[in-house]
Amino acid sequence: MKLPIYLDYAATTPVDPRVAEKMMQYMTMDGIFGNPASRSHRYGWQAEEAVDIARNQVAELINADPREIVFTSGATESDNLAIKGVAHFYHKKGKHIITSKTEHKAVLDTCRQLEREGFEVTYLEPESNGIIPIEKLEAAMREDTILLSLMHVNNEIGVIHDIDAIGELCRAKKVIFHVDAAQSAGKLPIDLQKSKVDLMSISAHKMYGPKGIGALYVRRKPRIRLEATMHGGGHERGMRSGTLATHQIVGMGEAAAIAKADMESDNARIRRLRDRLWDGIKHIEETYINGDAEQRYCGSLNVSFNFVEGESLMMALKDLAVSSGSACTSASLEPSYVLRALGLDDEMAHSSIRFSIGRFTTEEEIDHAIETITKSIGQLREMSPLWEMFKDGVDLSTVQWAHH
C-alpha cells in the first residue's frame, strides 16, 4: 500500500494508464504530432481526424452533438468563456445574472469581474443541506435576467442540483442556463438531449484525463451565442482561438470514453468504499456529514469532527492525502466559504475534512484511513480543553471568554 493514501479525487485524478498510453502516440516524430489546422498535408489531416474522434467521444459522454463541443484549457476557462461570453453578447437584453454562494471560484470571481463592468449579480444562499430550492431560483429571476450559472455537483460537499428541473424553469423564463459540470461529467449520467442546459463546463483532469484541457458545451438548438474572450486564428468556430493541443484532446476523449463505459461499475465500487469509510468513522462522537446525505455524488464525503482544529487534524492525518475545502482554497487558513454558506459556524467549518474516493481507491486503503482517523481524533481531543469541558456537560456557547 502506497502512503500517503490518496483520498482527494475531487481535487484531481491520476491519469488512467490507458489514457496516458494513448496520449503518447500523439507527441513524437513517430506519432501523430501535426497541427490539426494544417490542411495541406497528411500530418495535419491525421491530427484533425484524432481531434474529431475525441470531440465525438466527449459529446457522447453528455449526449450532445460534436459540433456543440468547444475545447478549452480547462473548466476555469470554460466558466469564464460561458459567463463573460453570454454577458457581453446579450448585455442589451439585460444585465442581471444569478448564481450561488457555493459556486467554484472560477464562477464567483468571473461574476465579480462582471459586477465591476456594470452587471448586477444575485448570489443565492443554499439551504443547510447545500441545495438551492427551485422556488428560490424562480423568485430571483427578473425581466432583465440573462443568465443562471449553477454547478451540477459541488466540489466541496458533493451535493447534486437537479439540472433537469432547473433547465425547464430557465427555458420557460427565457434565461440562459450554464452548468459547471467539472465534478459530475464522467461520474454521473448527463443527457443534454433531455436536459435543457445551454452551456456546460467540463474538465478532463477530474475524470482521469490530463490537466490543462477541458471543454465547453454550447447548445446549437436553440442557438446560444457567445462573445469570444480569446482572439487569434479563429479556431473552434471562432469561440476559442489557439492551436489545438492534439495529445491533450485525445487524452480527454479517451478518458470520456472510458468514463462512459465504466461509469456504472465504477460508481457501484466507489459507493461501497464511501459507505465503508462512513460506517467506520460515524461512531466517533460529534461527527457530522456536511451537505445533503442522499442527494450527493457517491465519491464525496465532507465530515466535520467537532472540537478538533482542522489544520492540526490535517497534520495528524499525514498518511492521508485529504483536504479541508477545495484544492484552490485549501492553502488558506480561512474556513471554507461553502460550509459557511451552509450555516456552519467557524469552528465546525474549520474542523471539516473532505474525503473524495475514486477509481483506484482500495478497501485496504479505506480500512487504513478509518484506523488513522479514529486514532488521530482521539489523540487530538485528549489534548483539547474544549472537549474536556464538553464532556463535563458545559454549554460552550454560554462561556464568556476573556479577551487578552
UniProtKB/Swiss-Prot annotation:
Binding site for [2Fe-2S] cluster: C328
Assembly description: Homodimer. Forms a heterotetramer with IscU, interacts with other sulfur acceptors.
Name recorded for this polypeptide: Cysteine desulfurase IscS
GO-annotated biological processes: [2Fe-2S] cluster assembly
Pathway the protein contributes to: Cofactor biosynthesis; iron-sulfur cluster biosynthesis
Signal peptide from the UniProt entry: none
Gene that specifies this protein: iscS
Active-site residue numbers: C328 (cysteine persulfide intermediate)
Keyword list, A-Z: 2Fe-2S, Cytoplasm, Iron, Iron-sulfur, Metal-binding, Pyridoxal phosphate, Transferase
Organism: Shewanella loihica (strain ATCC BAA-1088 / PV-4)
